[in-house]
Amino acid sequence: MARQMTSSQFHKSKTLDNKYMLGDEIGKGAYGRVYIGLDLENGDFVAIKQVSLENIVQEDLNTIMQEIDLLKNLNHKNIVKYLGSLKTKTHLHIILEYVENGSLANIIKPNKFGPFPESLVTVYIAQVLEGLVYLHEQGVIHRDIKGANILTTKEGLVKLADFGVATKLNEADVNTHSVVGTPYWMAPEVIEMSGVCAASDIWSVGCTVIELLTCVPPYYDLQPMPALFRIVQDDSPPIPDSLSPDITDFLRQCFKKDSRQRPDAKTLLSHPWIRNSRRALQSSLRHSGTIRYMKGADSSSEKDGEGSQDIAESVSAEKVGMSKTNSKSKLGVGSFRSEKDQSSASDIGEERADSEDDIMSDQGPTLSIHDNKSSLQSSTCSISSDAKGTSQDGKSEPDGNLEMEASEGRRKASATKQVGKESSIQMQQRSHSFGPKGEDRGLRKAVKTPSSYGGNELTRFSDPPGDACLHDLFHPLNKVPEGKLNEASASTPASNANQGDSPVADGGKNDLATKLRARIAQKQMEGETGHSNDGGDLFRLMMGVLKDDVIDIDGLVFDEKASPDNLLPLQAVEFSRLVSSLRPSETEDAIVTSCQKLVAMFRHRPEQKVVFVTQHGFLPVMDLLDSPKSRVTCAVLQLINEIIKDNIDFQENACLVGLIPLVMSFAGPERDRSREIRKEAAYFLQQLCQSSSLTLQMFIACRGIPVLVGFLEADYAKYRSMVHLAIDGMWQVFKLKRSTPRNDFCRIAAKNGILLRLINTLYSLNEATLLASEGRSGQLDQHEALLSVIDHPDVLKTRPGGGEEPSNSQRSDLYQPDGDRPRSSSAALDATEDVKQHHRISISSNRTSTDKIQKLAESASNGYAVTQPEQVRPLLSLLEKEPPSRHVSGQLDYVKHIAGLEKHESILPLLRASIDTMPRYFSKTMSKKVMAIEGAASASGVLSGSGVLNARLGSDTSSGLLSHMVTTLSAEVASQYLEKVADLLLEFARADTTVKSYMCSQSLLSRLFHMFNRVEPPILLKILKCTNHLSTDPNCLESLQRADAIKHLIPNLEVKEGNLVDQIHHEVLSALFNLCKINKRRQEQAAENGIIPHLMLFVMSDSPLKQYALPLLCDMAHASRNSREQLRSHGGLDVYLSLLDDEYWSVIALDSIAVCLAQDNDNRKVEQALLKDDAIYTLVNFFQSCPERHFVHILEPFLKIITKSSRINTTLAVNGLTPLLIARLDHQDAIARLNLLKLIKAVYEHHPRPKQLIVENDLPQRLQNLIEERREGQHLGGQVLVKQMATSLLKALHINTVL
């Protein structure tokens, strides 16, 4: 039965030329399959490689078979022997020595033995190097060293396979689009086709070492094309950290980027890693036999375990160290600083490192606000007749203001390290004291806010706890501007306002003050006789006087004509009543009214904020935010914003009690809540972002970045200032100097969709800038445009189409990051709502120029006469001069100061008038008037569905409101934020691969690329930088290609004028270089889009960008038939010939010429161009003068040229090439000698006068010398292939000579 099956199988099996019988498939390669074969003559097993002839031309096939016949002469224990070749109609069969154990790549598979230990890798690599030494001595470059081409026997002998022929097969394949070799093991010069040499095999050896140690070669986690990109781009492939120093050094030698610096195979055999491991291996073999492998693996795993433990301990120690450092940096002395002290942060950072005890001082500032409330009350409200704390001239006395002096001293002391340490000790001593010292500090800070108070007013309310003096409470406040107290009545209900002065007449007020003074004097007398006096007594005292007068508190109106002496005690009582009304059980109107009155009171008496926060805190107010009533929520948010405004301590307090996530819940899109609430929430978050790094960190920790992303609304015209807030907030986040990498912030923002929003914002800002610029360049200047608006108020009327909801709290200065800190939390949010503002001729300097101009126009258009036109023009002239204002403390130093800024700084105080002098109900009245305008339209009417500005000035599609806004919109502000957005995109483009992958969506890239021809050069440069950064990541290249990046980039090379033209060309060429490198499809696409003329211009003009243009131009010869045709039509061959004089580019240029000729079409236009006398002379002269270090590399391109064109071959031979070839036969390099002999043979076969060639050059004698030298051959290592070629050529010459 068995005999019958065997016989049957024999008859069914294929046989080759009746000599070999094909068996099972044992391998599969790029150019065919490998079968086991049986030699029918002697019974030897062989390996038979079967290659399809489908894409191989007959001429190339003959060359390949000749190469195999030549390689049959090689014989070495560490190479697979070629036994011959057989050709059928469809296939070429290459007969090879059979190596039974297969390849190392198969052995290290996870399901077999897995990765090898270093000791075993040394055994195999040493044999690989010995095989390479032999091949290189014979003039053969392997070109494809890898685990799959290293075969092993059962005795552990290693043999190199698949050398020499793979190269010929690749070159012969007319449909190939790749370079020779397997991507992950290829050397950079092989990928770039800049000259393959023996050193290319050394690079592949290094990759094979990593493959045997880890089971995969370098970059195996990437696709082949990105891997090729990284091989060329990176300085060196990544080397595993766990390797020994010797093997690491071995790999660094293999991975030298410059092939000339790599050692040869013979040198590497003497490397310490190979030498030491060989000795250890011999000892191991003698003592332990085959068990050595298992023990080595165990010891290796133990070492790995110990290493992991050490690493874990190290990481743990680092974390502990970082936690200490972070705690000190976050909670240390820095938290006691005032705003002035930010400049000395570095010095305080040094003092933190000097003392770890500073950690205990963290708790002082925050806790001191809450504790010891009675002390704070007494410091604010108690009475004392001797005024210990403050003398009449405003000078502090030693005992009363010792703490203030110490605080000021600490501020000054922070400028030096030594004094900073003393300050740290003082702070540490105070950290456990929750008494009046910390409270006084917060109080003094609050009192300093109104800068209009006189010098002695600064310390008026900063008495120490023991001082119960109230003289300053009733001292005439003549230095307070008249408008300061007016706004308290702005929020009074209309019913109360109508009552006028009825509750308390002027005389009654004076009587009240007299009674109160008398009662105070009586209490002072009692105090001198030993009775105690505190804030509670003061309150009861005031209530008693008020009860005597039976005053209607609810109907109380603070008349602006009233004497300030009489208002203060009444406000104190009103304050207590209003605070008590902030309960969820109260009615909606009562809560809203109380909040509005408290806001007005806090504006006039900021020190009351300290009382409120200390006595009540934020928790009662937070309870009100749970109310479902939107009016209550909005009013409470306004109150919170007024309290925390410009006070870092209060902001930190609000953060610590959990206000951030609560307020964030109101910052979402308007479909979830009213726009007013969202604006108030935005103002709160803006304060946190711009005040201090601590509040910013808390904001980020509460997932604040997604909230900022949400503020980047698509409708820029409608949400202008909210968009500005988001942009500035993101920059604040990026500039935060903490241990968290900026890349993490980029990833969070990108994950939440910021990139598409940024690009839409970039588009909208660019359109706004263009519209603003057009408005400026119109026939009317800003003065005339404004006055025409004032004269014709109808211009503000809008066409029908919907309106805005009324607002009682708008901010024109909200989110203005480049201005002074907003003075009010209830100014207009953006320019589209400025029309709702009440009339103010005196405009605050912290508003944008746009807002100032517009408000004057709106005032006139809404019935408020401008009685003094001369007031308008000076303001406008100042606005013309006013530069973008600087950042406040804690903000980014982003805006570049324009020339002449300091010269105009004196203008700002002229505009810095009080903006809150008008009653708040003017805002309400104004809002109603705007709503009464028929068909009032939103500015968003000019926006497309994507939120992009589409209108132009004067167009019928734009609303009147937006047209007016755009007319007066400051182009500087829009262009400034346009630049910021472009810089933000650049930050994301510089991030890691994950962030870049978010940026590489098709729609996003397409939108970005379509902006190339719409933006000004500075913004265009930034966008091009983004594209260039993306192109450096191999994972982004496919996405860029799909988005037609090449098509959009190339037109930018046509820019010829401007200061930035060189930088623009640099970014474009660099991006194109990254995109087109290695990839022939992209090279062809670039050629189709007209890149070749630009490249030739850069090359011929000797531009600095030649370094990018030259490789691209040379790659075009390899790209496609179309690209080669374009090259020829634009004179590319002449450029290549001129590059032969360039030592660095000559080899690449010659190879490009050879490729163009090899792929020449039937018209033979390339051949005709090369047959010109100048071209022939250039080629011959180049061969003669080529530097020695490049000589080996130019022989293969010359061989391609003369074998592809017999006419060029003959012309070169008769014009001086033949003597040069024969003269260089004494070259000692075997690779050079072998190629020279091939060149001489090709020239001889096509020479018109072969006998003359033989006689004139004494060719037989030169060949005989080579053969005899080879026979002696000790010092040249026996170059077998050279000998074989010389012998074959000599026989051919002998035949010709005989004939």
Swiss-Prot record:
Modified how: Autophosphorylated.
Biased composition (Low complexity): 374-385
HEAT repeats: 25-62, 86-125, 218-256, 532-570, 611-649, 653-694, 698-736, 743-780, 781-820, 868-900, 901-939, 955-994, 998-1036, 1043-1081, 1085-1122, 1125-1164, 1186-1210, 1211-1249, 1279-1299
The Protein kinase domain, residue ranges: 20-274
EC code(s) of this entry: 2.7.11.1
Main location (coarse class): cytoplasm
InterPro entries: ARM-like, ARM-type_fold, Armadillo-Ser/Thr_Kinase, Kinase-like_dom_sf, Prot_kinase_dom, Protein_kinase_ATP_BS, Ser-Thr/Tyr_kinase_cat_dom, Ser/Thr_kinase_AS
Coiled coil: none
Residue positions of the active site: D144 (proton acceptor)
Family stated for the protein in its record: Belongs to the protein kinase superfamily. Ser/Thr protein kinase family.
Protein's name in the database: MAP3K epsilon protein kinase 1
Gene that encodes the chain: M3KE1
